[in-house]
Amino acid sequence: MQRRHILHTAAALALIAMGQPVLAQNTFPNKPIKLVIAFPAGGPTDITMRSLADNAGKILGQPVIVENKPGAGGTLPAQQLQSAQADGYTVAQIPLGVFRIGYTTKINWDPVKDISYVINVTGYAFGIVVPADGPLKTWADFVAYAKANPGKLTYGSTGTLTSPHLTTELVAQKAGIQLQHVPYKGSADLMLAVVSGQLMAAADSTGFAPQVEAGKLRVLNTWGEKRLDKFPNAPTLKELGYDIVQNSPFGIGAPKGTPPDVVRRLHDAFKKAMEEPSYVASLARYDMLPNYLSSADYTKFAQDTVGREKVLIDKLGLAKPN
């Protein structure tokens, strides 16, 4: 009788233990979620992602707390996922730089296989700006100065190997000019540098909009398929003769092995958060638009993008030595 009681008790405990992951998933989340983003506070990424996080927190019933982790070309949040618990309580912004890091830096994780892709949310509107009172009034002026002064035209971006950096270098290669790149950690510091004259130009997302609207900066070009509504006089790269469109889509990832039910819960909450007018309005401030991809489509995007980024890295001669 005692032996039967022990067996029944052991079986019951085993069933309880087996049920714990399911219970955890069904009650997710029961504490705050951390969203790590790749750029500093006060810039367009920070402002728009905080709006998204605020909306998602209300939907999930738990706060989504933003943590800024700038540097390393926007790849630090993805690296943080490699040591985070796969429970959905740490998620991260995945900028395009994540898909090129393996070609330029020795890493011990795979950008496709070692991240659970939750949802793509938006992309950037980029351009090149110069001081409004400076000598460079048009893109033709920019190219002419750079050709006459090889390596002396300074421009900044939000970091080495970011999309603004690499796209500008690709344009420079096509234009036959040599520029001097100065990396910054975020848009706020970058804009201060170009407005104050420390730099001759900046390649950035439209975090430059307030400075342009204040008459301090001039937009020489933008990088979308069509001209931006805020800056209709600025030509696209395609109009200037470069077959380049860059909007650098980004979304949210979780650690590898995050339970599918948790990924689905996060996806559904962030998708609803994307549809809130407050988030759409925060994007519009920077000429950005919602750009939804489901978890499956975002995973496929990651796989395809890793291949495309290799072509760009090779073209610019930036691949790490074997």
What does each model-identified segment do?
Residues 24-114, 152, 176-203, 211, ...:
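N-terminal (or domain-start) structured segment
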Residues 92-98, 157, 187, 203-209, ...:
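Beta->alpha turn/N-cap motifs
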